[in-house]
Amino acid sequence: MARTGFQGRKLGEAFEIWTEMLREENITILMGLSGAMVPAGMRKIIAWLIRNRYIDVLVSTGANLFHDIHEAMGFRHFMGSEHVNDCKLFEEGIDRIHDVFAYEKEFNVIDYTLAEIISEMSGVMSSREFLEEIAGRLNVKDRNSIVIAAYESKVPIFSPAIADSSIGIAAALAKREVVIDTIRDVEELTEIVVNSEKTGVIYVGGGVPKNFIQQTEVVARLKGYDVRGHEYAIQITTDVPQFGGLSGCTFEEGVSWGKISGKAKKVQVNCDATIALPVLAHGLIGIRRQKYPIFNGL
């Protein structure tokens, strides 16, 4: 595909860059995950990427992780339609995510299940530690799960805006003694980047996960470390840069901030991630990574 035109070429270039990252001996690959990717059916792909160490760190919205836990506990999202009477859906207790449906009462079961788990936790934790605790306490029915794959593979997950999700709602319902310190997230993720010889980033969408990874280079520089910016970069987005939003921000703009290396191998794929991600994952099947980082210090 890299020898075709338009976004087909960009998708092919993304595959080539990802493949090159996997062949590097001393690199940490960080993925930012935003948008409703789990309801859209991308959950098993992300879990597979984690288990096979095609990525080493995940920064995600809390919503994707909540929906992942929802399915891990045996519930499902359903194929629906955007051409419906939403007032009728509300009366029937059905939540709509574009053309995907889910039952509100099932979401509520997960809300209260998480609230019960959180009530048993205490202390000050990063979101990574918090999510590891939850994953270790869940009695799951489906292990094709992002949080379970990460827990079992020792791949750290950060969710710096976790309060902005149903996991945050569950925490608000809990009789909680646990405190989630998101500044500790900043410190932990920056430490991972600083201790990596090279870093590569893959962004599905943008938002908080993207900037949280991007800013590690700035934090490291302010702390006195000699960093060069991320050296590989892939973004899959449907947004454009003209309106100033981060989700459409180009990697060229990131170079001006020192977040992306001026010599980085980079590509932006303007495509629906539910199209691009399965194609990329299919291409990666035959590639086996020989060496990946182990985060003993976390």
Swiss-Prot record:
Pfam families: DS (PF01916)
UniProt keyword list: Hypusine biosynthesis, NAD, Transferase
GO cellular component, one term: cytoplasm
Active-site positions on this chain: K259
Pathway field: Protein modification; eIF5A hypusination
Cofactor: NAD(+)
Top-level lineage group: Archaea
EC number: 2.5.1.46
Known catalytic reactions: [eIF5A protein]-L-lysine + spermidine = [eIF5A protein]-deoxyhypusine + propane-1,3-diamine
Any GO molecular function: deoxyhypusine synthase activity
Record-stated family: Belongs to the deoxyhypusine synthase family.
Chain's role: Catalyzes the NAD-dependent oxidative cleavage of spermidine and the subsequent transfer of the butylamine moiety of spermidine to the epsilon-amino group of a specific lysine residue of the eIF-5A precursor protein to form the intermediate deoxyhypusine residue.
Record-linked HAMAP family: DHS (MF_00153)
Stated name of the protein: Probable deoxyhypusine synthase 2
